[in-house]
Amino acid sequence: MARLDESGLADLAAACESEDVLARWRAKVVTVEGSSCAWWTGAVSGRGHGRFWLSSGRVVVAHRFAFAVVHGVEAAAAVPVLGHRCDNPLCQRVGPGHIVASSYVQNRREWAIRRAHAGSPLGDPRGARQRARELRDMAREDPALVAVDLARLRALCGEQLALW
């Protein structure tokens, strides 16, 4: 995410306090049986992350908005990188095992290690963007389809072992 200037941080703070904006964000998040992630069903970036419009002309990475809602705008602004410990760029769940504060170096190191594990979603042959779009579309249509696709990937590639 490009660093937000003062105006952007003010927009983010206002969005975090707006029931209308929060309701709009929540409407784009679904649960999938068998997954502890909160799945984004809105717009997706080229890297497979959710994109969320705070207001006209102001878009943020959806999980950064979620982090700001949970931890506050100052905390979100202070964190250079948010890591997905669940390896799901669509995930909106903030907390251990999912979206956590990280650094660029730590995030890239963890990505490289986990990508090499059999069954890792990071090694999905569709690539991050296509995988995210397909899973997002499934989650929109019927969240149960996501569970089927995740099971298919595990059967195809094997189970991913926990890194920690």
What are these regions (language model features)?
Residues 58-164:
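Short, cationic Gly/His-enriched loop motifs
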Residues 1-56, 74, 86-94, 134-137, ...:
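Short helix-coil boundary/hinge micro-motifs
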